[in-house]
Amino acid sequence: MLFEKSVLVPLGADETFALITEPDRLRRWQTIAARVDLRAGGGYRWTIVPGHSASGTFTEVEPGKRVVFSWGWEGQADLPPGASTVTITLEPSGDGTIVRLVHDGLTDEQAASHGQGWTHYLDRLAEAAVSGDAGADEWAAAPQELDAIKSAEATLAICQLVLRGIPAASYQNATCCSEFNVSQVAEHMIGSITFLGGAAGAEFPQTTATTLEAQVAAAAQPALEAWNRRGLDGTVKVGPNEMPAGLALGILSIEFLVHGWDFAQATGQRVSVSDEVAGYVLKVAQTIITPEGRGGSFANEVPAGPDAGILDRLVAFTGRAA
């Protein structure tokens, strides 16, 4: 059984090919994180929504024309990586390009569910082709059965969306983090990502990324992939200390969501987060941030107000005035 769908986008074939294959472009409409080795025999891993990552191998790559890759979901026995095939063909049409997607090797039930998914994301592809970014993905907003991995992926998506909205001219804007501008807060966050990713065995290739969003994404992708491989059982070594694995990874959710709020405040943006995700991160913060830890990494808690939402309560707990 197969699913097939076409969409017309107002871009040339080369621009469209970049939009469907390059990690920086994929994050604008389909993925939270993407690793891509774009060659025949090269692998990929795309985190589509929190807790759901597809992976496989490219079998055909014709830049500007066609890409074929195996497809499956990590951790799913009914459609594991490599169990099906996706073919995307690009055909020039007037001033635009027709994107034709065929997903083969599915059961009837899988074709129906993947049809819903591909329709959703091809609509977002068309939107990104027009506006440059399809914006927040409603499917990623409130993951079911939240755990430390899903929370980290959900909050990363939120933070990256804010970072994509920051022009380079605003990188020096002051933030509510004392004496740190936007660029410096991002640098601090990347340090936290590599430190905590290293606790799960992540390796970080050199990056040529220039935007803050791309730099954060280049660190976050291997970090979260390593945590997915390792899982949340047992403890990990964080500096000189042993910590429960889930608690150590939970620090990244605080980093992504709270610093995403910092970036938004510094650049005139708003953070959109579900109560489920914000509430999960608040509980993690209340576990990690102790009175003894105040005054160093975290300022003293400030009043949040009786009508404060969960995100406002979180940032107030970390010493920020909403």
Describe these PLM feature segments.
Residues H188:
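Conserved catalytic neighborhood of penicillin-recognizing serine enzymes
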Residues M1-R35, P143-Q144:
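Hydrophobic ligand-binding cavity/cleft-lining segments
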Residues R25-W29, R35, R39, G105-T107, ...:
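Structured surface interface patches that mediate subunit assembly and partner/cofactor docking
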